[in-house]
Amino acid sequence: MAVQKHTVALFLAVALVAGPAASYAADAGYAPATPATPAAPATAATPATPATPATPAAVPSGKATTEEQKLIEKINAGFKAAVAAAAVVPPADKYKTFVETFGTATNKAFVEGLASGYADQSKNQLTSKLDAALKLAYEAAQGATPEAKYDAYVATLTEALRVIAGTLEVHAVKPAAEEVKVGAIPAAEVQLIDKVDAAYRTAATAANAAPANDKFTVFENTFNNAIKVSLGAAYDSYKFIPTLVAAVKQAYAAKQATAPEVKYTVSETALKKAVTAMSEAEKEATPAAAATATPTPAAATATATPAAAYATATPAAATATATPAAATATPAAAGGYKV
């Protein structure tokens, strides 16, 4: 089933200017048949003293505090501009227009960041995150038509940017449902995206405050608990789409790495894939088809939820389930992911 067309909501401000009101007499153009004796003119009233103009309200500024946060705010703004630009071109040109507009905005943001003294190390870290997000989006953009390709690209990039913003604890407006409505995803899937996204943000925040050697453990425990609490009764029964199951296995496999920070960063990358995978749910023909594609009950027991994957998979199982391609790609992407 082709990716359904997303609804792009653009809020256009329309200024309605009213003309001055005219009197009925002037409109009719009539003069009295018998002019009345004019009344004595009234004493002119003393003009009132003009009120002091109110001080214009200050334009609210962004809430970002670090250079990384300021940069991701600009990237988010570029995302919005790219969506707006793509909305006014023919379907066949949407993908190209979005990529070009977003690329220009991103490059401009990095140039401005360097001009303001943004540290090269931090820039490289954020660049790595953004590159990984763009790669995920590009891989997802496999629609049958140019517009479907654009829709898949934007939906996946949206979720990837949300995760990056969550990692950086950015308080700016995130490029999510305001502009791009992923209407083809079932309501349950949308709720799950939000729950995993919230759990991820909670875990990333907790891990950021932990010592380097404890980051992965803190992240894992916090994420597991948040998922279990948010899913409630569905915790033991919910079947994720196959792509998500594979990503969760990869996240668990990260525990086999030797360095604590490597375990944490590889897990971050894998969970980012997990969140973006859910934005591709519209590619499934039907919810039933997605359930059919879910691994066997035995495998699902170990991987149906992030917490289950962490808690029940053994090191040997993790080694067996992580595909060679994923295992090869993840460490390379992890290089710039120090949070």
Curated annotation (Swiss-Prot):
Gene3D superfamilies: Group V grass pollen allergen. Residues 285-334 are annotated as: 6 X 9 AA approximate tandem repeats of T-A-T-A-T-P-A-A-A. Pollen, starch granules. Residues 1-25 form the signal peptide. CDD domains: Allergen_V_VI (cd12805). Residues 36-58 have a biased composition (Low complexity). This is Major pollen allergen Lol p 5b. It comes from Lolium perenne (Perennial ryegrass). The lineage of its organism: Eukaryota, Viridiplantae, Streptophyta, Embryophyta, Tracheophyta.
